[in-house]
Amino acid sequence: MASSPERNDARRGHKPRQQGHFSRRPEPVADDWLWGWHAVEAALANPRRGEPELILATPERIKQIQAKFGVLATVQQADNQQIAQRLPQGAVHQGVAMRGAVLEDADLGDFVGGPGAVILMLDQVTDPQNVGAILRSAAAFGATGVVLQDRHAPRFTGALAKAAAGALDKIAVARVVNLSRALDELTDAGWRAIGLTGDSEQVLGDVLDGRPTVLVLGSEGEGMRRLVAEHCDELAKIPLPGGFESLNVSAAAAVALYEASRPRN
């Protein structure tokens, strides 16, 4: 059931008013926009998001926003061309874009481990499309969260959010300074760390045992760094019977998450 406009306005601190119309004056493209219906819808529903500065939407999208979230004072009506002016060239915005809703990072302590729980840790995976796809898989398979390094990881831009198809706001993401120390903290809290590498003799399916698990994936070119691998409890590989040497990191994450989601005795 949709929330009433008045209740949503009270919750968000807005006074209901008529939707404004976006000015036709072009402004510089900014990199703090989210676009696409799934990304914007998930962001508006996420309590870890700050208040948006501006939402540009076509009349049809405004109706959808009002039906689900009530009347928001930050919404302005715009046509597709006006929305596209604010976004990177080629952005597929589907008639809606949102600016300025900052996403709060999760803390490692927020990740509660139970039987079968899985965290993904990404070691220097820098491509926004890959990270977005990994977040989407993590949300689809019910992962507890994702851990990134605060450097050598992409910012949460609109391109990443679009690739994640709303998953950026449906799964907790923690950014840490040092992955090795983060692994120590998680293992002290009862998590078991398994690093994925094609050099291992062990197969992932044989190493997983149903305990709370951190799956660590490295970049496609370099893989996991040595120090990160040394802080894992086990190293394992994804078997590739077709003879191909490796998978794209987002594909590897999806396969690993599927394997981890299978019931185990």
How should each PLM-predicted stretch be described?
Residues 194-248:
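Active-site/ligand-binding-proximal alpha/beta "capping" segment
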Residues 41, 46, 139-140, 162-167, ...:
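Structured adenosyl-cofactor binding patch, chiefly the S-adenosyl-L-methionine
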Residues 129-133, 224, 249:
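Short glycine/serine/threonine-rich phosphate/pyrophosphate-binding segments
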Residues 1-113:
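N-terminal positively charged helical leader segments and presequences
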Residues 113-202:
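RNA substrate-binding interface of SAM-dependent RNA methyltransferases
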Residues 59-60, 80-83, 151-153, 178, ...:
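Short, ordered loop/turn segments at secondary-structure junctions
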